[in-house]
Amino acid sequence: MAASDADAAEVERLYELGERLSSAKDKSQHAADYEAIISAVKGQSVKAKQLAAQLIPRFFRSFPALAPRAMEAMFDLVDMEELATRIQAIRGFPLLAKDAEFVSKIADILGQLLASEENVERDAVHKALMSLIRQDVKSSLQPLFKHVESGSEIREKVICFLKDKVFPVKAELLKPQAEMERYITDLIKKSVLDVTGLEFKLFMDFLRSLSIFGDSAPRESFQELIEIIQAQADLDAQFNVSDIDHIERWTSCMYMALPIFMRGGSSSKFLNYFVKQIVPVFDKIPEEKKLDLLKTVAASSPYATAQDARQLLPPVVQLLKKYMPGKKVEDINHNYVECLMYIFHHLAHKTPNTTNSLCGYKIVTGQPSDRLGEDFSEHYKDFTERLTGTEETVRAVSKRLTQGMADFNKAISSAKTEEEKTKIKSDQQKSTMTMRAYNNILAMAQPLRAKSPLFIGDKKITLSWMEQPKKPAPTTTGGKRSQPATNGNTPASKKGRGEGAARNQLVNRAFEGLSRGGRGSGRGRGRGGRGRGWGYR
């Protein structure tokens, strides 16, 4: 009973102090009253502490000399066991944000409180943080990103808060736009040095949505994004075929960069790494990772420069010949051949006379690199024999596959369970994709038979795993027929009708599956430390 009376007396005393401060014209003359309110935080009364959590922020600005003590008292309140006391203190924090120094400290504390397991408390933290950010974006975001950068235990909670609460209202918060977009870009660049694949995807997705990296941005801006991705791919490290995490990270990062290659970013560093580090040990790479590597390079090959094409063509030709049989065989690795032949066409389109010494062609550009005076007839004979063997094999396998495709619908109709139907449909889909690959191989092999062949350098071929372009509606009006790709000596070909679908697919592919994969053996979080995030499906 005595304790209850003491609590009531303490609460009543605080009410009186609060009323006196509210009515005072010159509050600075009542510093002792404010000190008494601050001291109540150290008392025994829970209700008095809750009331102090309301009164301290209310009069905070009137007593700058007592600001440090008031701030410490508020920090003590959010450490209390009583949930109601903590929530009251959290709600009062935005009222303490009178300058940048206090804002940073409060944002840091609120960032730590994001780890709360109580929904109502976490909701209060979200609202307090957003109120704080709206008051001072720079001073609020900087400590939050510090948690991400330093790898503190609550980093994932902070990232979720940024994703769910901050990023969606960037247009409201980032003003003036150019200055604040640059500020948050610099914060992100420091934070992504050590993140998981899913986290990296989140931050890159956000950066690409900023106006400073928009369609009208200068090419230097696109290159800045490429450099961020290059750093994540660890292109300065020696390639280790046993480091699955690095293989997955390289593949995922290059795919992530594809939309930026399309907009003018340079793929040179990725392609040079592929030539110098990956191709020499390609045979030693695990089979399940080889195809992802080849698909990545294939998708990026249309955006290679002529200089990169000259460097990349020799190893590509060697790999292509390895998987193209010299005579008809039972089957070929159609996925590898499709990728390599697609890469070959797009690179050769950029630098056609490079193929003279590699394949024995007779392409005339008037440059010394034509090497027309040298005899490469054996190369031509070998290459065309391999083309013949590949085509004969593909035609034979395609015929068998076509006959089998007709049986799928019958099998689905006769299937007794949904599980059986699902499996049959899955097999049918795989067969359809395989048929697309075979058709692509035949379409790409045919133009390579001439001494001066036609290299496909436009969007005529849609790789089998990409979204297939829709067929155009029939038209009765006349129109120009599309021109075949040439050796690269004519103006650039018009964009093919499948480009939009392919582009969307590439963007989706770049960002899908980044949270999958096993624990890596590389360095840091997401590279062995947290070890998740860089595997393809």
From Swiss-Prot:
Q: What is its biological role?
A: Putative anti-apoptotic factor involved in the regulation of tapetal programmed cell death (PCD) and degeneration during anther development. Interacts directly with the DEAD-box ATP-dependent RNA helicases AIP1 and AIP2 that form dimers and bind the promoter region of the cysteine protease CP1 involved in tapetum PCD.
Observed effect of gene inactivation: Male sterility due to lack of tapetal programmed cell death (PCD) and degeneration, leading to defects in formation of male gametophytes.
* GO BP field: pollen development; regulation of programmed cell death
Point out the signal peptide segment. none
Instruction: Assign the protein's first listed, main location to one coarse class.
Output: nucleus
| Protein keywords | Apoptosis, Developmental protein, Nucleus
Q: Which gene encodes it?
A: API5
The text of the family note is: Belongs to the API5 family.
The protein in question is named Apoptosis inhibitor 5-like protein API5
Q: Where in the cell is it found?
A: Nucleus
**Spans of biased composition, class Polar residues?**
474-492
